[in-house]
Amino acid sequence: MNQEVMNLFNQQAQPVSFDQIKISISSPEKILSWSYGEIKKPETINYRTFKPERDGLFCARIFGPIKDYECLCGKYKRMKYKGVICEKCGVEVTLARVRRDRMGHIELAAPVAHIWFLKSLPSRIGLLLDMALKDLERILYFESYCVIEPGLTPLKERQLLSEEEYLRAQEEYGEDSFTAMIGAEAIRRILQELDLDKIANDLREEIAVTTSELKPKKLLKRLKIIEAFQMSGNKPEWMILTVVPVIPPDLRPLVPLDGGRFATSDLNDLYRRVINRNNRLKRLIELRAPDIIIRNEKRMLQEAVDALFDNGRRGRVITGANKRPLKSLADMLKGKQGRFRQNLLGKRVDYSGRSVIVVGPELKLHQCGLPKKMALELFKPFIYARLDAKGFSATVKQAKKLVEKEKPEVWDILDEVIREHPVMLNRAPTLHRLGIQAFEPKLIEGKAIQLHPLVCAAFNADFDGDQMAVHVPLSLEAQLEARVLMMSTNNILHPANGQPIIVPSQDIVLGLYYLSIVAEGAPGEYKPDNAKNPMQGVYGDMGELEHALAAKAVSLHSKIKWRWTGIGPDGEPLTKTYETTPGRVILSGALPKHAKVPFDVVNKLMTKKEISAMIDTVYRHCGQKESVIFCDRIMALGFNHAFKAGISFGKDDMVVPENKWSIVDTTRALVKDYEQQYNDGLITQGEKYNKVVDAWAKCSDKLAAEMMGRISSVQKDEKGADKQVNSIYMMSHSGARGSPAQMKQLAAMRGLMAKPSGEIIETPIISNFKEGLDVLEYFNSTHGARKGLADTALKTANSGYLTRRLVDVAQDAVIREVDCGTTSGIKMRAIVDAGQVVATLATRILGRATAEDLVAADGTVIVKTGETIEERHLPAINAAGIQEVKIRSVLVCATKSGVCATCYGRDLARGTPVNMGEAVGVIAAQSIGEPGTQLTMRTFHIGGAAQIADSSFIESSFEGTIKIRNRAVAKNTDGDLIATGRNVAVVIVGSDGVERAVHRLQYGAKLRVDEGDKIKRGQRIAEWDPYTRPILTEVDGIVAYEDLVDGQSMTETTDESTGIAKRVVVDWRGSARTSDLKPAMVVVDRDGKALKLPRGSDARYFLPVDAIIGFDPGATVKAGDILARVSTDSAKTRDITGGLPRVAELFEARRPKDAAIIAEKSGTIAFGRDYKNKRRLTLTPHDGSEAVEYLIPKGKHIHLQDGDVVELGDYIVDGNPAPHDILAIKGVEELAAYLVNEIQEVYRLQGVSINDKHIEVIVRQMLQKVEVTDGGDSDILSGDQIDRTELTDYNEKLLAEGKKPIQGVPVLLGITKASLQTKSFISAASFQETTRVLTEAAVNGKVDTLEGLKENVIVGSLIPAGTGSMVADIRSIARRRDAMILQQKQAESGAMPVEELPPAAAE
């Protein structure tokens, strides 16, 4: 009886809360302990009675009843027999739900290897036994025998014997003299007999003594897996299965279809195969069948079990009846349709609906229009409860009837229920957190959801048929979070850059722009010298002005004088007069009254940018509530006046410049000229192409400028008053719709088109859309247009995948503490590109905490260490002329798991310091991923002039005095100053002695300034020829040739058009005769002896292939003259990987194709002996360490000479640097700066602004691992990769014990790799390569402590971020209290000490 009572309690088990999940390999005993019985038959259900067969795959006796509280034969029914086991059919009377969690098992007649541990690379069984996978498979699939016990025979242990060899050995040495086995039994036996401790010790000794390069890596891998088995308590023989678990039947259901057929889960088929083969094998063994038959059956059993676990990993894919591969257990987990991504990370939710959206201009910002029908359905439970409470209905059934009939009282109650109950609206794709926002519903007729126009930008919604989903937050907590955190009024700023996102667009912008136009000569305008009517156009009162407008005494655009009353800085009323227009006065009426928001904010032409700045000003000074009210007001104003203005355009508004054809003809003549030059052989095909494309691009731009000039000019009417501005220009200039590029296509010329490959077609489209295209032009333009459409589709998928990888790598970066107390930081300065300031210092440091005091020149501290730089500090920082600020960054944050608030700085979406528990990683990932679809996909070929123009000179962006560092300059024959060194740098020093800028000069650059010169902004410092790389002489003397033999290493060509002879170095390595020549030019003295260079070597300059020689032998040269030059055509059309592929390349930390070679030490360069087709360079470091050797392919131009001195980090060969090299050579800070700048570069091209800190968060996640260079006194081996935090933990322990700490260097991992290497195996498994991750985790017996967000979503608990971050704290407090109470109780009762108590269950 007692047992039955216990059973009663066992049934309704409460869900257990847990803190961590461990995964390990299950032992046969464990599988049996889960099982409720063995499955002996392959039958599923009886097709006549539809009852499950006994001992079959759906057996009710093993898995539980089909109907709640009813046994199979019907003897026991109802609750009262709960827990009784029917003696007739053996079924326990309980809930049918147990069929979802009761497991069965199959006893295998022969052991079988688990395919994951065998075939998932690297093969765990193979590593453990140190056997090749091929050999293992030969044993397992019964092709070879394996010697287990050689006995006294000459056979070796684990030697493989084929069938013949085995029989021969048996004959030779006798049957019992040795033991050889075959199949999984053999492997199991070997695994059982392994002595892991002994192997581990042997391996450690071997690693210590080995000298080769690759051996330790292999041994390390093996040692790791052996240690994994030792630590995790897994036994190696468990990788061979003797029992196969059978998952609960309701997870592999059999569903009756109409027509008497059944749809079944593939797993049932796979299980049936295993059971059939297993039963057949059992029978064959009983019948003592011949060995060969039994072996074949065992092999088939092995294959059946393989297919069940992972179909298709080995051998043929097992297919079902319709030739479709069967879904195995592994397939159930992996991929987008697998368990992780389909059901655990994203679920469908109830209490939701979706409908089309329409615009709701009369809504307030916090409202949305919800159709009554939808509201009635969504809020049903609330309505039922209310009807019950008010006594309209006694039962739910009655309430249901009332609602279905839509009685009037139901509508009243719906109104009550909805009041202040926010709903969430979501538009797919949800690319960032503003894709879901909360609104208060307002009931409307009709069936479409109404959306406030200002939130469209955040949702990226438009009203051309978009749909949105509505979700109802049910619990009080959910409603609270929706209201406080997700309400649209609380999301005014964009999390990516901190600018307002509730910005008017399109009609609203057009209306406000129209409102703020000024027109000359409009009626009733104010004229200062108006003697007849001096008071005309002077107003001081809003009513008076409105009256004048209504009477048409004055127009919206007339110039008037206006007396404005506002609030002064001291809070007192303040009046001021402004010259303005009535339109602007009306606009100013919407402004909140505040000292920092004067009339000047609206007294300008309101383009979209100005409106955004205005909203920003209002938000920063007046706070959130005022901004929301203000936004609603200007929205109404904008719509109203756009409607009143009635702006529209006709075809005559597209003005074609009348001088169009003359410009086009000029260009045509130019192009003809280039064609002729090409035909005469003066220029190459490539040069001609570049020049032609260039000419047409210039022509197109010139036409566009002409057209813009005509459209934007204001016409006068006969009275001299301004006519209305051109409508198209208004739309484009205000930022409402259309761009100059589109206007150019409408009214100037369509311009150059691209082929699908991205190359530009030489023939442009000269017509515009107003004139119409002819057939050929139309055909040309279809080319690029189709490519555009195809690109868009690809781009979306690519961008989504990038976002997914970013979220995955950054999901556990959460704010965990207020200040980690680190003293380090990173230096920030303005980004200057080709003399243009691209990002000012102020924008980069705003909202970040300082890492050291910011001190002005007079010694006053502007910002103290650890304080955040706010807007109010910026004027002082600019005034102090500070160029570089050291700020805190997440890259240097010392918080163990997560980041600290001080290092992160301001929360951009709120404008306040970041909150505890904010999931900054996910925000960073969304901010970088969301604009992904706006980036381009293709790699550009930038033709001709485009790239050259920006890289041939340096301009100063500061005023100051010039200093020249590493001065290696010489005056050449023309009297110009030439930089003859590789690291000459021009430093601009400000008046206060602070270095303002440092410019490294190109070798051979012509200096326009000298030491001590004063320089102004915009003045040129130096310039160089971008088309050539010069080889300069550094001494004065006479030119001599060495090994320059005409016809062997040099050719002389005469230019036909000019008759000038040109000497070019040709490839002399082609033939054996000439291959040992070393063509060079030597500078000699009068006696023909080579002159010495300052650094001691001869003045001998080796010439690369294709060098054009500049002097004849015997010519006199001065230092700085160009002896020879190499033409750099290659630089002109280098593919620039742009857009998304570039961003992905940087985040994945891939090595670029033509990676630059970077000097890893400062030192001297020497050329060694050439090696095959590579040049050998040796770098002898100045610090006396070992020389470094570089092998460089012959084709690459090395712009260094023998004996040149390079600094650490200089490029030896140009190209894109590999991020790993930057990290290794220049360190973390340089790497971060490089990645941030390169990624920002791509986004800047598209006009997308993202704050640096987001990229820093991702880079921090990429730098989490450290490679151990010296294990110190720990058991960690060098070459291992461990977490940064683990390293510090280990070292703290080691130093405390007075031992030698571990040394390591940071490693950069790409985002995919970093995601797969997170501590949490659940997170990694749900990301990619599920099988591999789970196999590895199981072998290591990994424990997932559920610290990140993803793991918690998967196990279904609250995420430890945001409002959920408190839960962890509360739990730990509760645990401490529990422990204290226990101790008190023990102290009182003198019970056993805490250590021996069973561990407390996690809350």
Curated annotation (Swiss-Prot):
Q: Which reaction does it catalyse?
A: RNA(n) + a ribonucleoside 5'-triphosphate = RNA(n+1) + diphosphate
Residues that coordinate or bind Zn(2+) 2:
C820, C893, C900, C903
**Pfam families from the UniProt entry:** RNA_pol_Rpb1_1, RNA_pol_Rpb1_2, RNA_pol_Rpb1_3, RNA_pol_Rpb1_4, RNA_pol_Rpb1_5
Q: What class of enzyme is it?
A: transferase
Q: What is its EC number?
A: 2.7.7.6
Alphabetically, the GO molecular function entries are: DNA binding; DNA-directed RNA polymerase activity; magnesium ion binding; zinc ion binding
Binding locations of Zn(2+) 1: C71, C73, C86, C89
Residue numbers binding Mg(2+): D462, D464, D466
Query: Needs which cofactor?
Result: Mg(2+); Zn(2+)
Q: Name one GO biological process term.
A: DNA-templated transcription
User: How and how many cofactors are bound, per the record note?
Assistant: Binds 1 Mg(2+) ion per subunit. Binds 2 Zn(2+) ions per subunit.
Choose one Gene Ontology CC annotation of this protein and give it: DNA-directed RNA polymerase complex
According to its UniProt entry, the function of this protein is described as: DNA-dependent RNA polymerase catalyzes the transcription of DNA into RNA using the four ribonucleoside triphosphates as substrates.
HAMAP family to which the protein is assigned, alphabetical:
RNApol_bact_RpoC
| Record text on subunit structure and interactions | The RNAP catalytic core consists of 2 alpha, 1 beta, 1 beta' and 1 omega subunit. When a sigma factor is associated with the core the holoenzyme is formed, which can initiate transcription.
Q: What is this protein called?
A: DNA-directed RNA polymerase subunit beta'
State the species of origin. Answer: Methylobacterium radiotolerans (strain ATCC 27329 / DSM 1819 / JCM 2831 / NBRC 15690 / NCIMB 10815 / 0-1)
